[in-house]
Amino acid sequence: MAENSESLGTVPEHERILQEIESTDTACVGPTLRSVYDDQPNAHKKFMEKLDACIRNHDKEIEKMCNFHHQGFVDAITELLKVRTDAEKLKVQVTDTNRRFQDAGKEVIVHTEDIIRCRIQQRNITTVVEKLQLCLPVLEMYSKLKEQMSAKRYYSALKTMEQLENVYFPWVSQYRFCQLMIENLPKLREDIKEISMSDLKDFLESIRKHSDKIGETAMKQAQHQKTFSVSLQKQNKMKFGKNMYINRDRIPEERNETVLKHSLEEEDENEEEILTVQDLVDFSPVYRCLHIYSVLGDEETFENYYRKQRKKQARLVLQPQSNMHETVDGYRRYFTQIVGFFVVEDHILHVTQGLVTRAYTDELWNMALSKIIAVLRAHSSYCTDPDLVLELKNLTVIFADTLQGYGFPVNRLFDLLFEIRDQYNETLLKKWAGVFRDIFEEDNYSPIPVVNEEEYKIVISKFPFQDPDLEKQSFPKKFPMSQSVPHIYIQVKEFIYASLKFSESLHRSSTEIDDMLRKSTNLLLTRTLSSCLLNLIRKPHIGLTELVQIIINTTHLEQACKYLEDFITNITNISQETVHTTRLYGLSTFKDARHAAEGEIYTKLNQKIDEFVQLADYDWTMSEPDGRASGYLMDLINFLRSIFQVFTHLPGKVAQTACMSACQHLSTSLMQMLLDSELKQISMGAVQQFNLDVIQCELFASSEPVPGFQGDTLQLAFIDLRQLLDLFMVWDWSTYLADYGQPASKYLRVNPNTALTLLEKMKDTSKKNNIFAQFRKNDRDKQKLIETVVKQLRSLVNGMSQHM
């Protein structure tokens, strides 16, 4: 039962395998047959049996089919045999036809091959044309690039390169020539950069050389504009009758208008001739280089290089020549180069974007301004010529106005000019010191004579002198001052004009200018003129007459100071009543000069007295006096009388002081003559002769040589001599010794030491020359009295020494 069940199960499987074998390709039968052996043992036998049964079935079907079609096959063979002959004939015909076709086809093949070859050529030509049409624009653009490079149109060349790279090269990137072009473009760009940089360097060198010309042109233009504006202002002021500008020459209004018209016409012509910076410099290299580097994307490198090089040039421009201070051309060249530099930078600032910024120019200008101020401060200190300093100021003002017109701040320059103004005043003071010295050297120190009205008016026009008494006098007459006074007055006004020249165009108010003029004038008066006067007064060749005239001159110059103040007021239109207005110090200046002159008069007078006294030739051993005063003393008194007559033009106190000083000095000199240590002996006759001379001095003092003394004030100058001589002449020692130290003493002014010195000289004389022989013979008691007096005088002297 079990075996039957197994056999039943394998039959369908074998049928499946048979179906699979029948329907499967023979190459795949192996796995199917293997499955037969992989099944149950002996299954293949059953499969073989099943296979044999299947084969037998198929053989039967084939046999049936053959039997069914056999008659038809026989009929077909019969028909085929019938057409066999026709087939042979057809074969022959076909062979012949084929031969003929082959023969004819050979020519067709040849023509066909030609046609194919032509077609290929045509296709290739078409392809080439298409490719050439694609490449030609590239080649044309590259050729254009080469032409632009040759023509130095580098910016256009860079634009062409951009087009080639962005538009044309992608079309033909597969071709070798395109690769070569692509590889060559960076080199061309570098060449353009180098060429552009070379052009920029040439440009920088060119503007460095032309900076002075550029600056000169810009400064001329600024100066012309300023002059034109000033001319218009003058015209408006004249039109409205406001003469705000005081000129030293009074030109009629019609002449002013004519001159102004010509001036304006000249300014118009000059403005037409002035070139601009674009006319003087070709800026195209900068533009090209900037555009090229912008296109190349390296604009920052270009900007850094340009600014670095320009800073180097700025340092070179700001470095002055060592001898710049010697001539105005040195300063002018320095200024024009700086102006040229910054005019170029300003132009670059306004025509380019980013290459030069306002912050960069401001930084550069601040650096330059500090250097300029330091240079001008240093070099101007070497200037000793006021005209050169004034030229420097004018150049600096034009320089500042020019750069201010380009937007650069210049206030510090005007502050510097304010400093230089002090130096300018110093140079003016030195110059005017020479002028004053020349005036004093040329003066004859005598009153100015005038013989007619014309000469009188000439003097009045030069110096503001008013004296009704002098006006009433008939010609010829004399002004009290000498010729130097109007000359000094004129030169002081000239100094004010010169000082005003520097103050103009400094952008200062009228009040400041007024203050500056007054201060500088005060310096001229208190320092320069005062110093010149003092030096003049102390000169050895200046005599008493000249000193008297100098005192008179200073008096009139002092009175003229108020006119100088009015003169400054007319220039500045600042009233003297203004709170902060500086006053002129002429009063103290001329007072000091007068005091110095007075002191010099006293000194000179004393020196003259000393000269006369040195002529004294006393015989100190004479036994009897001559009976008349010494000749030298009479000459001295006559000299003093004549001198004091000249002093009548001096203020009373000056003459009185001089007279008192002279008498006191004469008294002192005579006293010193008596007490001279080299004088060892003196006789009573010499004392009597000396007394005659002192009497003449007292008579001179009592004659009132100078009015104004009260009583015998002048005689008191000789009181010491008088009491001493009276003591010896009267021989009143008992009274002297008894009253010594009493306020009411008759010989109060006689010093014991002085009396002792003179008495010892007389004592020695008596011993050597026997002057007192009669006393020794007739009255030895008197000799003892002398010795007693000497002892008492020594006792008084010693007592005084101990008390002191």
Swiss-Prot record:
The gene is EXOC6. InterPro entries: EXOC6/Sec15, EXOC6/Sec15_C, EXOC6/Sec15_C_dom1, EXOC6_Sec15_N, EXOC6PINT-1/Sec15/Tip20_C_dom2. The exocyst complex is composed of EXOC1, EXOC2, EXOC3, EXOC4, EXOC5, EXOC6, EXOC7 and EXOC8. Interacts with CNTRL. Interacts with RAB11A in a GTP-dependent manner. One of its GO terms (biological process) is mitotic cytokinesis. Keywords: Cell projection, Cytoplasm, Exocytosis, Protein transport, Transport. This is Exocyst complex component 6. Belongs to the SEC15 family. The lineage of its organism: Eukaryota, Metazoa, Chordata, Craniata, Vertebrata. It comes from Homo sapiens. Component of the exocyst complex involved in the docking of exocytic vesicles with fusion sites on the plasma membrane. Together with RAB11A, RAB3IP, RAB8A, PARD3, PRKCI, ANXA2, CDC42 and DNMBP promotes transcytosis of PODXL to the apical membrane initiation sites (AMIS), apical surface formation and lumenogenesis.
